[in-house]
A protein has these predicted regions:
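Alpha-helical solenoid scaffolds in large eukaryotic transport, assembly, and signaling factors
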Residues: 2-136
């Protein structure tokens, strides 16, 4: 199955949910194995979900935004997965069009999005990199 075949029978929200759950499960397995890796198993027939979820390839910006929100909701209580989605897909999408940062800020009433913002802000503050970039409250 590929992206368009999946979307012919499933929703963008379902794609995001599956991406989030797969990411969470890989992080948990890597943590249990103490090896730190989160690389998808190339033999997995659904590994395309990981690629599409991570980089949004084949999705419009609006579609990718929906997928990311659903992924965040699917992992709302998992700090590692929330951080990975923030540092990966959310940053990737804003890199495609920086106006989308405003859309993410507008979704901060959603607990999963707010949690991702908190984690990314903590991370960026710890880097002492001179600011939070689009993650900052002043960007909203």
């Amino acid at each position: 199955m590929n992206l368009r075949e999946f979307l012919a029978v499933q929703s963008l929200e379902e794609l995001g949910r599956r991406y989030g759950e797969r990411l969470r499960d890989r992080l948990d397995a890597a943590n249990a194995a103490h090896d730190g890796g989160v690389i998808a198993d190339g033999l997995d027939s659904d590994s395309w979900i990981d690629e599409v979820g991570f980089n949004g390839e084949g999705l419009t910006d609006d579609e990718y935004f929906v997928v990311i929100l659903a992924a965040l909701d699917a992992v709302a209580g998992h700090r590692g997965a929330l951080w990975c989605i923030g540092d990966g897909p959310m940053d990737h999408l804003v890199g495609r069009d920086d106006r989308l940062a405003q859309r993410f800020h507008a979704e901060r009433g959603r607990e999963s999005v707010a949690a991702a913002f908190r984690l990314m802000q903590e991370y960026l503050d710890g880097l002492d990199a001179g600011g939070r970039g689009w993650w900052g409250d002043e960007f909203a």
